[in-house]
């Protein structure tokens, strides 16, 4: 199915670290012509610059950064280090920082008719009225292996134990934080990626949900 010009589709994709949400969200965005945004990269971008520049006032510093942020700046391999991952969970607890990034994401979503944003609080906080809310789940060992393969492209010395530990800490912090914790939206569609045979199976499941929604909304 090809979406028509008048079709409006807003998708939220949430889940823990390396659960498959980024891959799934990117692939269905490409398939259906959706504007894609990773909220995780926004937080990593914020962490990277706070650690690099150590500003006196984090909030005013980040406001300026996000007022001029282009999505091309998010394509930075250094954003994916374990150090950045750990720091990201720390700043994610800060409501003022979350508000800056929330405003950026909402503004992004309002610019387009067809949007997919992935993260950890998209379906519950950023896009609570999304047409479709996907929630990705994955066994921690499998998720850690996925992340290890990704990280070893730039850091051959990193180990499975390090990655798994960092991911466990990250997920626990995200679930337990006071502000916008990682929780499954009530009406979310579960995508259990470790139970699916391959990426094609994941895309097929998501596509079926999307096309059924479009047919209900606009007719066959």
Q: Can you annotate each of these PLM segments?
A:
Residues 11-13:
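Hydrophobic anchor at the beta1->P-loop junction of P-loop NTPases
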